[in-house]
């Protein structure tokens, strides 16, 4: 398969089949497109840039309905810089650009959206398998250049790696694992204590569940997910990460409709969302995100958050989204319906950015941004009922 056909196949899978870049690449390549690991990595990075430039290509290709082969040819020939429209230059849909501009201004929107063009890798040191010091020495021996986060010492930001992250020995052996900083901050907001029972409402694939146990091994997690397949994968992952079997109870359920015999200490709702905050990880999101998808997830999150507040007086609600529809808007509805207090833990008050300023509670919720925190775009909130204060 020549490059035009290969790139066209990747675009087809992303746009028509609505799959991630990783899935599209695997389907197009089928392990036959290159001979060596180095060639595969180079081709993958080209596909990443191609998919990231999809909207830009649509803007500059003159045909009204260009084929995927037309777009692939244009990209190979370098025709990606002829449009003066800001959303075209940033290769995002016009509605998304206008929405972010209304929140951050044109300069802020451009800075954030450009920050998504390069992926930042974070590794979590898995102290269930080995002490932090040992894993750091192993990473250094592999030639990895990194920096340890000042507030969360088990999180390290990769500066330079001699090989793909997945091929580092500590990663292959689960003593370190790729996990974004924002994910770790979300779990830290729970402030899990000895003996706590924590419900993870949407638990798979299990990284946050495993981190809860890593931070407090005497805690117990009831982990719900709507997919039996994802739960099977999660069970295997928890075992590989060294999570004790008696620390986590997996349960298949739609969390909107669960009921418990008694309240639990805390709830983590890392809600299904548009993933608009993880464009750096999967640029296909720029090409396929729609207003309808955002609205669907916003409504679902409200249902899940209302149920979460039935289960506990302390709920941490997070989304990997840069849009207030999946964050501030949901919280605003909850504040009107219930008597909750929004709390940012003291250790994160100077670290977090506030929520979007048009909301009266913006200083009591947390936003993380790629251009400020070197993380995914995240919304994080902690809701407490008065009796829990």
How would you describe each model-predicted region?
Residues 1-389:
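S-adenosylmethionine
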